[in-house]
Structure formats: structure tokens, C-alpha cells
């Protein structure tokens, strides 16, 4: 059975009439529907969403915050999730059976989540077990499919976010001697290193060659990193940092831990989306910042803090393209179909997958 037990009906083409509507008319209709539906409708929005979408969010946050609000909301019948596919899956798994989760555009995926599929993961686990026996525990970044979360759940593991990665990695080492971290090698490496694990005690599993890449003694490997990454944060480089240091020596550099180890090591600060937002918020007026994260968020931070000099670490950075698929026309389309009693782009995860994935999610949520 497919992980998505049903996605009824699957709609990917926005009706033509939404292309012809003015922004003002669309905004007016969204306001009308939100007012009409009241608590029956809940719209969570990720920080990386466009301003035209975030303005209508009932809750804006990073992956951890949105997982928490999804789990705590018991009033809404409809949850229209303005994020990407894995986030909507998580919302469906953490809400009740009578709550309906809708993703405005089914094309809003995540390339990182797609870098670890369940067949690859099961195969990797089998091969790694031959090497290390029953000494491993899996952790997966929430930026992963429901199937990968379920794999971690049934193998004693948990999910993590960039906000709680250190806490969850520390917990994992109270359970087993070794950690398998999926699917983002950079978050896993940066977190483990920050906790005092040297690089030569980390290895990388390549799912395309089914091979383990390492430099040190295999017996001393503590962390096995999945060879995946975020296509947005991969674009920040040490060269970007060198340019900022040269041209703006008094500028602080803050990056997301999905950036590679070399970039994080060369930066002044590194932390989750919430950490970055809070750091800029609390910084003194007149301070200068180069931020290494998604462009929609950077632009919003710039707008919110005119008293500070803020730039993107990479001046040629673009937004997360899949996150950007959720726009005002798609949001309105989803809301108007609900208003008519129709349901498009419903996310409904298979119940067995949900049961196992929720084990992993709850092991995280009960510790944060």
C-alpha cells in the first residue's frame, strides 16, 4: 500500500480563473473565508513561505514549532498547511482522524526528503547491521518522508529538528553506541561535532553505491551520516564568508546548520530558523548581519529590522523553489474548495505508517 493511503482527488493544475484575479481580490476572498470559518480552519505557515502567504498564517514557525501547533490544535476541522509535503504528512499524523490536512499545491515537495527513500534505508540498515550489529539507533531530521519516520519509530529511534538536534543526538547516545542520522549529513555532522565527536569518528553512507565512506578506524565510528543535503543551504560557501569578511569586517555571520561543516565552522553563529530570528531580534540597533538561510526568510527579517544592516550571505541566493510553490492563488483555491464542501489535495498517511512514525515523533516531542 502507498504511504499516502489516499490523496483524493489529486489536483496539480490551478484553475485558470485564479491566474486572472488581482492580488487585492484574492486577499479579500481569503479574509472572507477565514472569517466565515473561524476556528474550523487553521492555517500554519513555515517561515520560508512567501509574504503573500505568511500574512494569512494563524501560526508561523519552524519545523518544530509547526509540529507542536499541529499536535495541540484540536478545534480545526481543516488544516491548510502552507509548507512542504513532509510537513503536511507530519501534521496529518499528529492530528485526530476527523481533522483534514490539505496541502495547497501537491508539487510542494522537499529535495532533501527525497534523498532517502524507504528501500534505500532498509537496505542500508541491513548492511550496517552486518558491520556494527545491534549497536545503532536511527534519528531522522523531520525533513523526511513519513516512511522514514516510521522506520525510525519501529527501530527505537526518533525525529529531530534543527532546534533540538543537540538534545536528541545526546539522548540517542544514551540508548546505543552508534547513531545513524538521516537524511541531512550536514545537520548531523555539525550537531555531532558540536557535541564533541571528532570528524574521524563519523562516516557517510552513500545510498547510491551502498558503501560506507570513512577516514578513521571503522571500529571507532560513532556517527553514520546519510549522504543527503538541503539544496538551498548547500549554496552557501566559505568563499561567501571570505567576501563578507573582506568587504564588511564588522559584520556578524549567522548560518543555519544545514550548511556544510566548513561554512558553519567559519561563521560566527549557527542555529535553527528560530535561533536566527531570535538572535537578530535581540541584537542591538545598528548591528550588521550576513544571514545564511532561505531567501524569503532573510528578506522578511530585513523588512522587520530596518534599524539593522542585514544581507544574505550569498548575494545570488534564491528562495526554496518547492516551498515557493505555495502561493496566494493556490491558498485561495484550497480555501474556496473547502467553502464549497469539496476537498482537494488531502494528505492522509497510511495508518500503520502513522502508528510507527508517531512513535518517533513523540520521542522527540516529549523531550522538548
UniProtKB/Swiss-Prot annotation:
Reactions catalysed: iminosuccinate + dihydroxyacetone phosphate = quinolinate + phosphate + 2 H2O + H(+)
Molecular-function GO term, any one: metal ion binding
Name where it's found: Cytoplasm
Q: Where is the signal peptide?
A: none
Any one Pfam family here would be: NadA
Positions contributing to [4Fe-4S] cluster binding:
110, 230, 320
User: What are the alphabetically sorted keywords of the record?
Assistant: 4Fe-4S, Cytoplasm, Iron, Iron-sulfur, Metal-binding, Pyridine nucleotide biosynthesis, Transferase
Entry cofactor note text?
Answer: Binds 1 [4Fe-4S] cluster per subunit.
Q: Which cofactor does it need?
A: [4Fe-4S] cluster
Domain of life the protein comes from: Bacteria
GO CC entries: cytosol
Q: Could you say which residues bind iminosuccinate here?
A: 46, 63, 141-143, 162, 256-258, 273
The GO annotation for biological process reads: 'de novo' NAD biosynthetic process from L-aspartate
Q: What main location does UniProt list?
A: cytoplasm
Q: What is its EC number?
A: 2.5.1.72
Q: In which pathway does it act?
A: Cofactor biosynthesis; NAD(+) biosynthesis; quinolinate from iminoaspartate: step 1/1
**HAMAP family tied to this protein:** NadA_type3 (MF_00569)
Q: Which NCBIfam families match?
A: nadA, PRK09375.2-1, PRK09375.2-4
By sequence similarity, the record places it as follows:
Belongs to the quinolinate synthase family. Type 3 subfamily.
| UniProt function note | Catalyzes the condensation of iminoaspartate with dihydroxyacetone phosphate to form quinolinate.
Q: This protein is called what?
A: Quinolinate synthase
Q: Which organism is it from?
A: Bacillus cereus (strain G9842)
The taxonomy runs:
Bacteria, Bacillati, Bacillota, Bacilli, Bacillales
